[in-house]
């Protein structure tokens, strides 16, 4: 736990209020940390990831000799200090070269963590497409049968979506969708990251024709080590506050198109007892018998 002294300034009080638990949490920030040793590949890859996550980022400039799979306490403590729930650690060693460790925390403890080794890397500077706009909302896509068949890969895919989803927004207009991040599970141990920019072209119809231009970075990973939370802790982390849950309404359902269908129960009505307005035009008039045509007076 991080020791917090008594706050004496208004700015310090605002910081504590911003870090406190909320019904609607703030957008998740990512902490970028370099291990004891890094190389050019790790440095450039982390710079590309840093540009993709801005402005929800915090960087630790110094090298840190963290061994997360032996002791995750330092990174959890650093996350509490900088108010970040996501982190990535870049390291390079003889036994485990070119490794990026992605992780996330929950309630002051480690939730999920996966060590991915870079097998191939192409920087975003090698692509001619326009780069990602600061603060834009990306579209994250998971493809591959391993994300559904393998339990660990399914959790790693969930971690990647949580890591790269960007700020929370209610709606995104078509022209505002500028980035598509695709994670492809080649098998249970290999993962590919590709980043594209949608290009809206003219078409014969009102709907534009969409083409994808790769904008980078392009990274292929091999899953090395992983430390995933148990089902009970993961379920607790995904639990929604009661204040955000909609109350169930009786006799109300929703079809596949989003239309609400309701059923109203009405008792038997006795129309004879209903007092209606009596209008002269609607009054019954007595029938007058017509005289026969051949009648003689």
Swiss-Prot record:
It holds the Pfam family Brix. InterPro entries: Brix (IPR007109), Rpf2 (IPR039770). GO terms for biological process: maturation of LSU-rRNA from tricistronic rRNA transcript (SSU-rRNA, 5.8S rRNA, LSU-rRNA); ribosomal large subunit assembly. GO terms for cellular component: nucleolus. Its main location: nucleus. Keywords: Nucleus. GO terms for molecular function: rRNA binding. This is Ribosome production factor 2 homolog. It is found in: Nucleus, Nucleolus. Residues 28-232 form the Brix domain. Signal peptide: none annotated. Belongs to the RPF2 family.
């Amino acid at each position: 736990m991080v020791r917090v002294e008594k706050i004496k300034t208004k700015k310090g009080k605002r910081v504590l209020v911003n870090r406190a638990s909320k019904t609607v949490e703030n957008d998740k920030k990512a902490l970028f940390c370099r291990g004891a040793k890094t190389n050019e590949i790790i440095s450039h890859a982390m710079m590309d990831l840093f540009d993709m996550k801005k402005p929800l980022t915090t960087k630790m400039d110094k090298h840190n000799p963290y061994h997360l799979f032996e002791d995750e306490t330092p990174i959890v403590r650093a996350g509490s200090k900088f108010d970040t729930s996501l982190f990535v650690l870049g390291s390079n060693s003889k036994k485990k070269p070119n490794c990026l460790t992605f992780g996330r925390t929950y309630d002051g403890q480690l939730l999920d963590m996966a060590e991915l080794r870079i097998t191939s890397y192409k920087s975003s500077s090698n692509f001619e497409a326009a780069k990602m706009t600061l603060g834009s909302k990306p579209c994250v896509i998971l493809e591959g049968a391993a994300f559904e068949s393998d339990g660990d890969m399914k959790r790693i895919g969930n971690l990647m979506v949580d890591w790269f989803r960007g700020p929370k927004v209610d709606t995104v207009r078509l022209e505002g969708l500028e980035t598509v991040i695709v994670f492809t599970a080649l098998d249970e141990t290999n993962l590919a990251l590709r980043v594209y920019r949608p290009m809206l072209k003219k078409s014969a119809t009102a709907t534009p024709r969409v083409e994808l231009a790769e904008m980078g970075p392009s990274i292929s990973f091999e899953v090395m080590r992983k430390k995933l939370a148990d089902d009970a802790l993961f379920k607790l982390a995904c639990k929604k506050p009661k204040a955000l849950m909609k109350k169930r309404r009786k006799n109300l359902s929703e079809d596949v198109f989003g239309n609400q269908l309701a059923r109203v129960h009405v008792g038997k009505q006795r129309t004879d007892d209903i007092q209606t307005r009596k209008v002269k035009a609607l009054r019954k008039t007595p029938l007058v018998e017509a005289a026969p045509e051949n009648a003689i007076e």
